[in-house]
Amino acid sequence: MKIHREGRSIIFTVFFLLVLLNVGCYLLVFRTLIYLFSLIASACFFSIVVIFFRNPDRIFIGDTKNIVISPADGRVVFIEEVFEQEYFREKKIQISIFMGINNVHVNWIPIDGEVVYYVHQNGRFWAAYLPKSSTENERSTVVIKRNNGEHVLLRQIAGVIARRIITYVEPNQKCRINEQLGFIKFGSRIDLFLPLNAEILVTLDQKVRGNYTIVARLE
């Protein structure tokens, strides 16, 4: 299992602290049962942290023309026509994917094109599955222009636990499916804003896989 670069320092820190904790427990607590419990609990916690930062090798091998690939693992929690007010200032179809703590938290580029807009905004830390998290939470907004001039907006949203959004792209950068967009640490959500004529290929509560599940088809 590959570990994502965003998790290496955290994993090392957690490992070091757990070693100190268990050494201290061994030296100061003279009860074998308590020490064994500490070892087991530490091993379980460390395993969860390592699994969270896993970085799977996923390559989409199909035709990428006119499709929108899921930018993240998770569950579809919202599909609705909304007024997007930050960039488009017009109605779009919003698809929201909630990433639970057990999901891979790598984010992928959903379409081929060029980045034309990127803004990071500080904000609140509401639960990521709530609709208001899209406009009130800490978030990064990326807009990608397709070759035909059409724009698709993607928004990385921090949740209650997630306090750090990593975004690798910047304006004027060419991007394509199979490339990583970024990473959100410890629970989060991704919003997609698509043209009204997009053919939506997912349903509410459907589980999706990043860089694998086709969520929509564009004209």
Swiss-Prot record:
GO CC aspect terms: plasma membrane
Record's subcellular location: Cell membrane
Cofactor names: pyruvate
Swiss-Prot/TrEMBL keywords: Cell membrane, Decarboxylase, Lipid biosynthesis, Lipid metabolism, Lyase, Membrane, Phospholipid biosynthesis, Phospholipid metabolism, Pyruvate, Zymogen
Molecular function in Gene Ontology: phosphatidylserine decarboxylase activity
Site keyed Cleavage (non-hydrolytic): positions: G187, S188
GO biological process, one term: phosphatidylethanolamine biosynthetic process
Cofactor note: Binds 1 pyruvoyl group covalently per subunit.
Topology versus the membrane: Peripheral membrane protein
Residues bearing the modification Pyruvic acid (Ser): S188
Enzyme class: lyase
EC number: 4.1.1.65
Top-level taxon of origin: Bacteria
Role played: Catalyzes the formation of phosphatidylethanolamine (PtdEtn) from phosphatidylserine (PtdSer).
UniProt similarity note: Belongs to the phosphatidylserine decarboxylase family. PSD-A subfamily.
Self-association state and partner proteins as the record states: Heterodimer of a large membrane-associated beta subunit and a small pyruvoyl-containing alpha subunit.
Protein name: Phosphatidylserine decarboxylase proenzyme
Source species of the chain: Azobacteroides pseudotrichonymphae genomovar. CFP2
